[in-house]
Every structure is written in structure tokens, then in C-alpha cells.
């Protein structure tokens, strides 16, 4: 969770170099954050959105041309006692929060929660040896698979975008006129 007393740590972790103003260059930020913030017994989705909204505003203050992509949280389970886990509905609630933030900030969303199978899907990922026993985090192979899926989706969106651009008519090179006396 973003706290005021951790500003420098958060800035450096999420946006290295954020302290210097960069009003001209366009940067992209992918937010794949929030699973630990949402993996609590009582989840306040408004506070969740407000804290990430504050972080986004801080980034936009020094880098106004930044584009954002939000990665929704994954499905997760909550440990209630030793070796006893229950489905955690907060992933779905956090997912909706990311879509609301994306709408507000005209950002993209990669819906990891739905892609992995929605509520209850983390058990399948664990059974496939892609998730850790805590039923919150992934094993290396799971993170690599998700990274590959994200990359392919991003590249496909880019290729779709450039395919929709208007074709440019090639211009003939201008003849160079020599100044001869």
C-alpha cells in the first residue's frame, strides 16, 4: 500500500528517476501491483483506488505524457489456519478497481484475473505447479508464463494499432538543383 512516509521508496521502486521533472518525453508504466494490498480479510476498494490514484497523479505531475497499463490482480486464496485456505473474493473486487482507474486515466488493462480463469483459478495454477502453496504468488514458471502472455498481448495490440493507421503515400525525392553560374 502506498503510504506518505514511504514516498521515496515507492517512487524509486515503481518509477526510478521520478524526482526529476520530465515534461516532454513519453513514458509507459505497467502497474502489476496490489495483490498484497488486496490479500487482506477486510478490503477497502475505495482506499485501494484512492492510493493508486494518488501515485498516478504524482507520476503525471513530473511526467505528464506517461501512459499506463494496469495488470489486474490474480486470483488468490486466504489462509485461515494451518493448511486451510478459502477462496478470496478480493481479487475480483480489485479487478473492478483497476478497470475504474483505467477508465479515469485513459489507460489500458491486461485482465490477468480473467485470463487465469477467474475466481478459484489459483488452485488450478497450483495443481499445474505454476503457483506457490500460499495460493497468492506464482512459481518462476508461472511468472514466466504470465510474462509471455502479457508480452504477446501487448505486441498483438501494437500490431493491431499500426494495422489501423492510415497508409502513407510515398513521396518522390525532391530533385536537387545545382546553382551553376
Q: What kind of region is each of these model predictions?
A:
Residues 16-20, 58, 153:
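A generic secondary-structure signal
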